């Protein structure tokens, strides 16, 4: 029964990892450089299933090493090599996730296939260094039953502890710390949201909406009503185009006026009243980003200028990339600024969201993998620390 289960696991491992390699190599959407880690990891698992597990199963069922002595040394070295490579691959993937989440735009520009291949090569070199002593140094292999050749790893305490730390405990500690750091970054980003000071793409202008009274007004234009009211004085006289307002800020002086080709506001008379809403930019920006309902203040009726040209005289603050239109009913439409900084910020936000989802999936996979390996390495190390008092039963091991 145990042999049948092991054979099924061997076939399942080969088939599943072959599908992973085939999917990454054939699917255009999976040809990202970081997926090369999955190809190398799947190759290591296939090598474990084909070159290690069958011989381990035969050794357990027969009770002795049936094959040649030279193959025993190669088998032990490959066992440590492939298993260590599999674990260190997961450690490298976790570091790649951390760099992608903490430095999304900067790291993604450096995440080239050449760089990923160099990291994979380093992973295999680390695994080779850890597995080399079992090939060149025989050491103490423990008691050997008479007439029954055995194939065991070096039983010396220093080798057991060194190989266990290098193959499992050190990579496991790195993975735990890295994923803890990723969790803290995600939690801080979720609590802060896009409200970070100086975040690119945070525009002060928003698409206009209909307000009571049939008038369109922008909720994100600071002091819009003050500009329009100041333009039309009680005598109906408009200022010259190039003249500045009293108390005009330096920011206002650098902005341009509406082009003359745009439709002008109609002459609606001195007594015509329209509702123009004044809203605080800071309060509404905070409420919008915290997910709360946007608060609107009651509209105060203000007199529109009697002269059509007077509405175009005062300069409106218009950021680069925004749209300002004047309709036939005298309604001002302000579009959201869509500059390069805004696009960069949204690309970073999308990239972070995708990396966090992928990180969660990998955290589950790595967690299961660590739980499967921990009992073996714990009992293996425990037997070296206290071989007599803490001896683990052979069947359990």
From Swiss-Prot:
Acidic residues composition bias: residue spans: 280-300
Keywords of the record: Cell membrane, Disulfide bond, G-protein coupled receptor, Lipoprotein, Membrane, Palmitate, Receptor, Transducer, Transmembrane, Transmembrane helix
Topology relative to the membrane: Multi-pass membrane protein
Region feature Disordered, mapped onto this chain: 193-212, 230-319
Gene3D superfamilies, per database record: Rhodopsin 7-helix transmembrane proteins
Location relative to the cell: Cell membrane
Keyword flag Translocase: no
GO terms, biological process: platelet activation; regulation of smooth muscle contraction; regulation of vasoconstriction
Residue ranges, Extracellular side: 63-72, 141-156, 386-394
Listed GO MF terms: alpha2-adrenergic receptor activity; epinephrine binding
Role, per record: Alpha-2 adrenergic receptors mediate the catecholamine-induced inhibition of adenylate cyclase through the action of G proteins.
Subunit structure: Interacts with RAB26. Interacts with PPP1R9B.
Sequence similarity: Belongs to the G-protein coupled receptor 1 family. Adrenergic receptor subfamily. ADRA2B sub-subfamily.
Annotated protein name in UniProt: Alpha-2B adrenergic receptor
Organism of derivation: Talpa europaea (European mole)
The encoding gene: ADRA2B
